[in-house]
Amino acid sequence: MNYGTNRFYGGVDNSDHRNTIAIPRFVLAFDYKFNSKWILGAEIEFEAGGVGIETELENSENGEYETEMEKGGEVALEQFHITRLIHSAFNVRAGHLIVPMGLTNAHHEPINFFGTSRPEGETTIIPSTWHETGLEFFGSFGKGYARFDYQAMIVAGLNADGFGRDNWVAGGKQGLFEQDNFTSPAYVARLDYKGVPGLRVGAAFYYCNDVTANADKNYKYSSVGRSSVKIYSADAQYKNKYVTARGNIIYGDLENSSKISKVTLSNNSNYYHGAMPVSYTHLTLPTTERV
């Protein structure tokens, strides 16, 4: 399976009167069944053309051409996991997994959100698409109007180095370097109600006991102390052949944010910068789409 999006921008407010066109991402995904109980899943994402050598026209430098050693995009392993199906109510998955916080992460394909871009509310304050390495237990229980799906996970926790003023904890997901820091893992739980045809109502909780322990240079946070992060989300979607309606709420709380801010501000890095508020609340009002 593959999916991607193409975007065209007409720069009417640009003094150069230039239009741009780009393919932000292209994704290849596949599942392989060893047998009826064991399944291998993988998803590889190419963003902004991937990596390689490119030539750019630098209009700000008298129209000079420059050859860059790498593009601004990336090739990322978004998912790679092995699943053991045991029972409809209890199954196990291990590997690189999607963290099911919010409405978009678990349903991030372009057909699952309105417009050409993912919702700003979620993508601004939490990672998107959020994927970490760990272990997951999942299943379904109940039947009829009392049917539920659940997920319980232990994954690599957020890295405090990536927290910032503009995006709260969105820059803190692991994967920047070759190895992920697993000193303080995160615990994730999600429950979805699916008893009514076309309706999905879900709630999720994320907890990491100490995000500073996952920092790449955690000795810089010795004066900060243990700093946990909690994120809560609730979302709902109703869909039939005439209309689609979606809504979600995200709330988060970070301990010792002012102290962490001082450390991240002092990090002389191209990757991490900025200060953050203690907590951030986002409410996405229900939206609808007629089809």
Residue ranges and their predicted role:
Residues T5-V12, G52-N59, G73-A76, A106-I111, ...:
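Outer-membrane beta-barrel translocator domains and adjoining extracellular loop/strand segments
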Residues Y193-L283:
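Detector for outer-membrane/organellar transmembrane beta-barrel domains
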Residues G4, A106, T116-S117, D149, ...:
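Outer-membrane pore/translocation modules
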Residues N14-R18, E68-E70, E122-P127, L176-D180, ...:
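Outer-membrane beta-barrel domain signature
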